[in-house]
């Protein structure tokens, strides 16, 4: 629900500011799961949705967006510096639709809309605090927009200033280098989707982290397949990176500490990739014996 609650906060914020009129359109650029959340919220509240997504994302996520009646626009996967990057493309499209759609349109802009971070500061963080009875020593997760990590960090640090906040970063992202050396620099690549940021978004502004880890695809997949085999949980790549990061943080802090992370994506949305023998073989990645 991390993406669904952010989607709802973004829409409610736009309503409160008078930016979103009845029957209006919500436009967003997303690697998938926020798009699904926005499409769901739009349908439930009587709005239209146009979702811009890199064509490299899994077919299952594209199908889920269409199931909620949203219009899906697929674009090439290019860096943020390119004007045709899915995020920047969606911003221009929102401007065009705002002028042409009779009921207007807004750009959700999850990366730089701090209503995203606020959703987690007001809901996710306090829920973690309550569910652990305040006995949380560390929180760690990956970053896409940064809303979850920054919002939860804000909430937990308000309750316990010495709580340890960690970043789990896939290869190909630049935040591990930023939080360890001060330089935004990426290395390698990853099959993970929707995480791995190359810039400091508005949601990340002001965030400091105590621990940062770089997680390889091999380490991520080992965790994902272990969750299936030993916990009966079929999860996606972001969850794999998150849990791998939590294991690293737990080892660093030592026994007796409570570490929290987020299991945020269903494996069913990645069947064509991380649960696909042909895809894994093509990428030279490990294949579980049961697949």
Predicted regions mapped to residue ranges:
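PLP-dependent amino-acid enzyme catalytic core
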Residues: 1-291
């Amino acid at each position: 629900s991390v993406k669904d609650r952010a989607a709802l906060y973004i829409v409610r914020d736009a309503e409160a500011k008078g930016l979103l009129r009845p029957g209006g359109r919500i436009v967003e650029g997303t690697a998938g799961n926020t798009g699904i959340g926005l499409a769901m919220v739009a349908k439930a509240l009587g709005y239209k949705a146009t979702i811009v997504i890199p064509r490299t994302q899994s077919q299952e996520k594209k199908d889920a967006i269409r199931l909620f009646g949203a219009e899906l626009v697929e674009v090439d996967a290019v860096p943020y510096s390119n004007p045709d990057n899915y995020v920047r493309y969606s911003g221009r499209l929102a401007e065009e639709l705002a002028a042409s759609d009779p009921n207007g349109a807004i750009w959700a802009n999850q990366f730089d809309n701090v209503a995203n971070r606020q959703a987690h500061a007001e809901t996710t963080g306090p829920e973690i605090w309550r569910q652990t009875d305040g006995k949380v020593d560390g929180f760690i997760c990956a970053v896409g927009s940064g809303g979850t990590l920054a919002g939860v960090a804000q909430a937990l640090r308000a309750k316990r200033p010495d709580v340890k906040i960690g970043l789990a970063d896939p290869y190909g992202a630049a935040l591990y280098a930023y939080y360890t050396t001060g330089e935004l620099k990426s290395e390698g690549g990853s099959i993970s989707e929707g995480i791995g940021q190359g810039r400091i978004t508005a949601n990340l502004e002001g965030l400091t982290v105590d621990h940062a880890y770089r997680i390889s695809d091999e380490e991520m997949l080992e965790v994902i397949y272990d969750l299936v085999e030993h916990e009966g949980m079929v999860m996606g790549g972001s969850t794999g990176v998150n849990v791998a990061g939590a294991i690293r943080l737990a080892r660093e802090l030592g026994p007796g500490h409570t570490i929290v992370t987020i299991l945020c994506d269903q494996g069913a949305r990645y069947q064509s990739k991380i649960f696909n023998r042909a895809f894994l073989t093509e990428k030279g990645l490990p294949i579980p014996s049961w697949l």
